[in-house]
């Protein structure tokens, strides 16, 4: 199996959000891949939608119903436990991708030998394949064989998790994987990585998305994600070497983003 795509799902049935995501995945131009959708105890009919796709695409589509709500990190971990692919990709269940999204990233990986490949993305407020506001997820100078300077740059601005594919060992050899029961788990997580400077991922902005729904719990989770980042820097013995960058990233995540969330 070349690729496993993991989709954490929680209450995305309304307005065809989940359908748009899944349709974009089952229509990918790569052939050797699987889709692992993890329902995180949805209270709408998201699980029923997932079961329909599993029925219609039995050789490609697998549904896991989580016994408890573990947030996106826990759902990702459940999916990873079932993943067979040499490469791992993640997608938010309210977003969608171009039909050749994974083909182009895998092609880039084969040509360069990179452990991780990413791309740019669109910001959009409606379901469409039209070009929206293009966001450059990372800088070209951050790519290639990762030096200390590139690591410093990536700590300060690592970009989004979901617009990348990862060599299996990068994720599965990571002892803590994703923290569970909190939002913003992306902040808690190669030797080389490459960037395809083309927007292939559609990031859907709406009122119920994780980063646009502000609650006390989510602000507390953001702060906990910052603490996790520091704990893991200590665990892997790179806190001292990259202290200024980690301190800056912690301050942004723990204080600045949380403050602006409360003010929004």
Regions from the PLM with identified roles:
Residues 66-83:
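Glycine-rich, basic loop-to-helix element that forms the pyrophosphate-binding segment
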Residues 2-6, 34, 188:
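Cell-envelope/extracellular polymer assembly enzymes that use nucleotide-activated donors
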Residues 100-133:
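Conserved donor NDP-sugar-binding/catalytic core segment of glycosyltransferases
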Residues 12-27:
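Short, well-formed alpha-helical segments that are part of the catalytic scaffolds
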Residues 31, 39-48, 68:
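A conserved acidic beta->alpha catalytic loop
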Residues 148-216, 221:
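Conserved nucleotide-sugar donor-binding catalytic segment
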Residues 88:
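Short aromatic/hydrophobic "clamp" motif used to bind/position activated sugar donors
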Residues 204-264:
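C-terminal subregions of glycosyltransferases and related glycan-biosynthesis enzymes
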């Amino acid at each position: 199996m070349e690729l496993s795509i993991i989709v954490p799902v929680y209450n995305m049935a309304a307005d065809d959000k989940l359908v748009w995501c899944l349709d974009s995945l089952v229509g990918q131009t790569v052939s050797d891949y699987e889709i692992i959708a993890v329902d995180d105890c949805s209270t709408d009919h998201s699980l029923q939608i997932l079961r329909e796709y599993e029925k219609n695409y039995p050789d490609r589509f697998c549904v896991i119903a989580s016994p408890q709500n573990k947030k996106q990190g826990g759902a990702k971990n459940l999916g990873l436990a079932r993943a067979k692919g040499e490469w791992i990709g993640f997608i938010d269940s309210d977003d969608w991708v171009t039909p050749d999204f994974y083909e182009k990233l895998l092609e880039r990986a084969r040509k360069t030998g990179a452990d991780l490949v990413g791309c740019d993305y669109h910001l959009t407020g409606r379901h469409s394949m039209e070009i929206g506001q293009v966001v450059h997820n990372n800088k070209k100078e951050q790519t290639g064989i990762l030096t200390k300077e590139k690591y410093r740059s990536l700590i300060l601005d690592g970009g989004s998790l979901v617009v990348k594919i990862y060599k299996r060992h990068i994720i599965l050899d990571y002892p803590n994987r994703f923290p569970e029961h909190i939002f913003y788990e992306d902040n808690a997580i190669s030797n080389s990585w490459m960037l395809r400077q083309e927007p292939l991922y559609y990031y859907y902005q709406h009122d119920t998305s994780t980063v646009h729904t502000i609650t006390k719990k989510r602000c507390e989770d953001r702060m906990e994600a910052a603490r996790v980042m520091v704990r893991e820097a200590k665990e892997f013995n790179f806190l001292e070497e990259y202290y200024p960058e980690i301190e800056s990233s912690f301050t942004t995540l723990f204080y600045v983003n949380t403050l602006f969330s409360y003010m929004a």
